[in-house]
Amino acid sequence: MANYYSDHPEFDFYLNHPEMKRVVELKERNFADKDKYEDAPVDFDDAIENYKRVLDITGDIAANILEPNSEAVDLEGPHLVEGRMHYASKTYENIEATRQAGLWGISMPRRYGGLNMPITPYSMASEIVATADAGFQNIWSLQDCIETLYEFGSEEQRQKYIPRVCAGETMSMDLTEPDAGSDLQRVMLKATYSEEEGCWLLNGVKRF
């Protein structure tokens, strides 16, 4: 069977980079999870093998599910049903396949249900998914938006949202500025916290 990871050995160039050892040590916090989680690596070599296994699973799904589904997704497309947007039926099949494989929340800590992988192998997985279906990659890679909440959100917010993203249950990017569209560089809206009002004030133009 085809595999969009193992069929392209050049991908391993990134994992073999000398800086990866330091990247892994930082992400794994010197392998502090090894006594807490069965799937946590015990050293650098173990971590790299973990990443390769995840990439191999990604490559298998990409070649044998995502790519074969891509034409049907394009032909059916998303559509409105009673005022709600629905993906093409094969898109839901793709989401379920990646969800069942545990390919959501890849970079999130294990305590939230993630795989705690660095951005480098996550980006490799994203490229593999895009090779099969660039449109689905845009949906699947929305999971990295949760990095912002992880870095700046409260623990209560993390506990509420991150496990759901790691389970493949939710994630979206909603742009409502008339001149921005999918171009994030053109977003002009500013959010300013008002101490007097005790809330965030949005300054700009939004269209819903």
Where are these regions (language model features)?
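Extended, charge-enriched "interface" segments that sit outside catalytic cores
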Residues: M1-V81, M85
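Short coil/turn segments at secondary-structure boundaries
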Residues: L26-F31, N69-H79, M108-R110, Q137-L142, ...
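Internal helix-loop-helix
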Residues: G59-D60, K90-Q159, P163, A167
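Charged, amphipathic alpha-helical interaction segments
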Residues: A63, E67-P68, A130, Y150, ...
